[in-house]
Amino acid sequence: MRITNYYYLLKGWEGNIAIYQYMDLDYLLSLLESKQYFVNRKCHFEDKGESVLPPKSLFGLNSIGVQLNKDEITKMTQKLSEKLNRYRESASWLTSCWTKDNTESLLMWKNYTTKIGVRIKSKIENVIASINTDKYKIVCGHISYDGYNSKPFEECLFSKERYYKDEYEVRFYFIQKDESINSLSGEFIAVTPETMIDEVILSPYINKNAAKIISQLLREEYSLQTVKLSKIELR
């Protein structure tokens, strides 16, 4: 990891990488009005692997058939227990999911928005720069889709099963510096929207006439200069 004053960027990643997030229009309007960005905790995500590591992830192929003495078994058990506990605790971390796929995805529109949805464009460095609080340590990296097998805790945080590979996910963790805070609800984080948002694309499910009105509203009321209609043509 590369360490700066308050965020960690996984090795091999640069801050100027473009990233995208799909959301409902009312969520975007709330963000613009309140300058508060809602981030959920990963324990609320649909994927069970976000909260609990699958048993098969605890043992590598090299463990099969290997005879260990009592001390080695004790050390291995302690190590696995620590990994499980740390990962279970990470389920309460505030987690923001983006994609690095610059091509519109009908699957993403369907999964992450209702009919009235938008896709915002940003950069890793812009998301970080937009945060107006020092309450969190921020960790960012891309998700690998080769499962959790025999990986250390830190790599498990940025891993998923291959079923999710079409997401091309880039993930931010917002880890509270005050460890006494013990909440399972999401949080609104203070942001500067104009720093975070470079571009908005409107959902292909929005009526064309309505899309033009929404586009004008976003430009005139919220000074979002780059608002585009979706390139996906639907009946």
How would you describe each model-predicted region?
Residues 1-235:
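Partner-binding and oligomerization surfaces adjacent to conserved cores of proteins
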